[in-house]
Amino acid sequence: MKEQEIIDALKNDNDEFRRLYEEHRRLEDKLSELEQKRYLTTEEEVERKQIQKQKLHKKDQMAELIRQYRQRVLQAN
């Protein structure tokens, strides 16, 4: 099963994954907004770093759910 197929299945069937995915997208949008600016204030730079950390944490959590899903599929076959 391809990664995108797993992501689509989890987005449809797993509330936790869907929540993480949506939050990750929201953080990505926020980060993009900050990166569009020519210069960042000190506060914006701190916010950018915090967003990057939060985004990475969400991505790690989603990766774990994908790994668990793959494991369940392999065990079922």
Language model features by range: what are they?
Residues M1-N77:
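Extended, charge-rich alpha-helical interface modules
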